[in-house]
A protein has these predicted regions:
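Conserved residues in the N-terminal Rossmann fold of short-chain dehydrogenase/reductase
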Residues: 35-36
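Short alpha-helix adjacent to the SAM-binding motif of class I
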Residues: 1-3
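Signature of N6-adenine DNA methyltransferases within the class I
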Residues: 5-16, 21-24, 39-199
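Surface-exposed helical/coil interface segments that assemble multiprotein signaling complexes
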Residues: 26-28
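Carbohydrate-binding/catalytic loop surfaces
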Residues: 32
Length: 199
């Protein structure tokens, strides 16, 4: 709770500095729906039932396949089961959990900020093949961009954002950058063969 109040205060100060005024503080004392669990062991549907109105977005931990702890490897094995190949980054477990969470729900959507290693080399097939085979499609993706943090001692990383849905009638979008920053340079669509094409 203290961390939430601190972040709210910092965000309000930044907004006041940028815009000249800040909103009222969030009613954080009245939040009764915050659950403290290992997200990879929790049954998400018991915490919040899946429905077409639910959208999962997040920024899971950035831990590559070479830097995982023994406990994190066990987390990945528990989530991925027989599909865990040893090369998957820790963040991929959130993609799998979200896809499973919405398994029986039409209209669910999820997206995560991830290190760009999920879209390179060995992890690509291990992550995307089972999710696409389950009927999900990439609704949007941001190609590599630089992620910086104001926290002391944190390394700068290169990230992607990938969002999934099952709504085939909605055009898919790729946000592409000439340099790894957040300036959107062009939009692209994804056809059924998973080939990117310009819109």
């Amino acid at each position: 709770s203290t961390a939430l109040h601190l972040v709210d205060h910092q965000a309000n100060q930044a907004m006041e500095l940028a815009l000249g005024q800040a909103p009222d503080p969030l009613p954080l004392d009245r939040i009764e729906t915050i659950h403290v669990h290992n997200a990879l062991h929790a049954d998400w549907s018991q915490i919040f039932p899946a429905s077409p109105q639910v959208m999962i977005v997040g920024n899971p931990p950035f831990i590559g396949h070479k830097t995982k702890t023994r406990d994190q490897v066990e987390d990945l094995k528990a989530v991925w089961g027989k599909d865990y190949d040893g090369y998957l980054d820790y963040v991929t477990a959130w993609y799998k959990k979200a896809a499973d969470y919405f398994h029986y729900t039409r209209g669910g959507r999820f997206a995560f900020v991830s290190t760009n290693s999920i879209s390179q080399g060995l992890p690509v097939a291990a992550l995307f093949k089972p999710i696409l085979a389950a009927g999900w499609r990439i609704r949007f993706a941001h190609q590599t961009f630089a992620w910086t943090s104001e926290a002391p001692g944190l390394a700068h990383v290169h990230c992607v954002i990938v969002g999934f849905d099952k709504r085939e009638k909605t055009p898919a979008t790729l946000y592409s950058y000439d340099t790894p920053n957040l300036e959107i340079s062009r939009g692209c669509g994804l056809d059924r063969r998973n080939e990117w094409r310009k819109v």
